[in-house]
Structures are given as C-alpha cells and as structure tokens.
Amino acid sequence: MVSRRVQALLDQLRAQGIQDEQVLNALAAVPREKFVDEAFEQKAWDNIALPIGQGQTISQPYMVARMTELLELTPQSRVLEIGTGSGYQTAILAHLVQHVCSVERIKGLQWQARRRLKNLDLHNVSTRHGDGWQGWQARAPFDAIIVTAAPPEIPTALMTQLDEGGILVLPVGEEHQYLKRVRRRGGEFIIDTVEAVRFVPLVKGELA
C-alpha cells in the first residue's frame, strides 16, 4: 500500500499522460523525501521541482516519469545518466534496470547521491565525477542515455556512445528549451521533439 500523498501523485501523473506502470511503480518505491533537504520534506511528493543546492534542482516527478518512459527501458538496458544531482532520477533508473552508470560534475553532489543510494540499498549504480558532455566512453555503448540538464545543442559524444537502436533523452536549448528524443538506427540519428521544458544548463567541465 502506498500513502495517500504518493497515490495522489501517481493519479496526477496518469492524468498527465504517463502510461508505463513500471515507471510509476518505481516512483512509488523511491522515497523522494530522502533526496531533498529537511526544509522541503513536506513538499517532496508535490509535482514540482525543488532546489538541492549548488544551483541545481531535483526534477519535477512528471518530468522524471516522462523522460524515463521515453527511454523504453528493459531490465537488461545499459543506461547512462548525465547529471546525478540528488540521485533521485538515478534511484528510479536503478529500480528498472540491472545497472546504471551516472556522471556528475559537482563532486559534493556526487558524494551525497552515493550516500543516499547506499542508504536505500541501491548498489547497482556506478557514479563518476566528470564532464557530462563527454559521457562515459569506457562504459559505452549504452542502450539508453538520459541527461538531466540542458545543453545548447546535443553533445556529439553522447550520440556516438549510443548503441544501435539506443535512445538518448535530453532537454536542449538556452532561453527556449525542448525535450528531445534521439534514436540511433542504421548509422543515422532520428530526432523527435517531445515538448517544451525548463532545466538548469548542462555546464562543460568538472567542478571539484
């Protein structure tokens, strides 16, 4: 049984068009309040983005669900996340696939996320402090790549690290941002625009 607050959020997400029950089950299973500061715990199950420090945010649950659904994951999917942040999106992915690779440019956030994931007994995640623009070449290719911050254009390195048939989901743009889905097929990249969004920028380089 899920709490009334969790059920209310799930009902809202279904009303917004989220159809993948496995994704919804993952959202219900991950305690979002563990990924926000105490001051925001009462708002943890509201369908809003919340600040996590360092100028970053934990994404709105709808956007987490939408982007995850667009990845078309199976348990065997090899997944790369760019922007570990709080670790919340990472935890959702870890409930859906056997292993997740995640890159974070801010070391303090990476450490906090690793601690949260460990406290929740989610050990099927590898995190790395590095430049998200470069992906994780040593672990490539990936069946799915998700980016939780917006570059002004799609990073070439991420496209080349997709396996055949793989899917990349990311926000793209500066003043005006759009969620894009990129599918690699036969040496070509098919790009679909999903909807208008608002994310923090994907900054190049790594930060100590």
Curated annotation (Swiss-Prot):
Keywords: Cytoplasm, Methyltransferase, S-adenosyl-L-methionine, Transferase. It holds the Pfam family PCMT. One of its GO terms (biological process) is protein modification process. The active site is at S59. Its EC number is 2.1.1.77. It catalyses: [protein]-L-isoaspartate + S-adenosyl-L-methionine = [protein]-L-isoaspartate alpha-methyl ester + S-adenosyl-L-homocysteine. GO terms for molecular function: protein-L-isoaspartate (D-aspartate) O-methyltransferase activity. The keyword Transferase applies. Belongs to the methyltransferase superfamily. L-isoaspartyl/D-aspartyl protein methyltransferase family. This is Protein-L-isoaspartate O-methyltransferase. It comes from Escherichia coli (strain K12).
